[in-house]
Regions:
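Extended ligand-binding clefts on enzyme/binding-domain cores
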Residues: 3-34, 40-41, 45-168
């Protein structure tokens, strides 16, 4: 793990970065965040040692490090140790590339980053409000939508976070 995040694929035997070609496996905030969402759900249900371990993991995740300081958007992924032979996006000097910028399935990243237990690792609300949103309306009600319109985009974060009675 680096700055609290782990790689997109982990070798089940060694617990290290790996899959078919470990050189091209990126550090992934989406994979780490997805695992954390599941752990938080388990922690809420079971409590005790699971809750303690979950928050120990969450406290190590430096969301500011994984966020572009200019755009305030989370980077897409990172190659902190060695750069791959080819990546479809530009990579900065820290190995970061791409970005999550508009409303999509990754909205949970903004929420986890804003609510990080350690203030020095939290992005606060600035990152969330920097997210690009596209608005539409239906029968006079305004709503935010994603460019692809895929159901997964709307359902993923909502499977873990109850947005009822919340308005932004």
């Amino acid at each position: 793990r680096i700055n609290g995040f782990w790689y997109h694929f982990i070798d089940p035997d060694s617990g290290k970065r790996g899959w078919k070609d470990s050189h091209n496996i990126e550090l992934s905030n989406a994979s780490a965040g997805t695992m954390l969402l599941g752990a938080l759900a388990a922690a809420e249900y079971f409590g005790g040692e699971i809750e303690k371990l979950t928050y120990e993991l969450y406290e190590t995740m430096n969301w500011k490090w994984f966020t572009d300081p200019v755009t305030k958007h989370p980077y897409l992924a990172c190659y902190p140790e060695d750069l791959p032979k080819s990546v479809p996006y530009g990579i900065n000097e820290a190995g970061m590339f791409g970005g999550w910028s508009a409303y999509s399935e990754h909205i949970f990243l903004y929420i986890l980053a804003a609510g990080a237990p350690r203030e020095e690792f939290s992005t606060g609300a600035d990152s969330y409000y920097a997210m690009k949103t596209y608005k539409g309306s239906y029968k006079g009600e305004t709503f935010i939508f994603c460019g692809t319109g895929a159901a997964f985009t709307y359902q993923w974060t909502h499977a873990f976070i109850d947005f009822r009675n919340l308005r932004d």
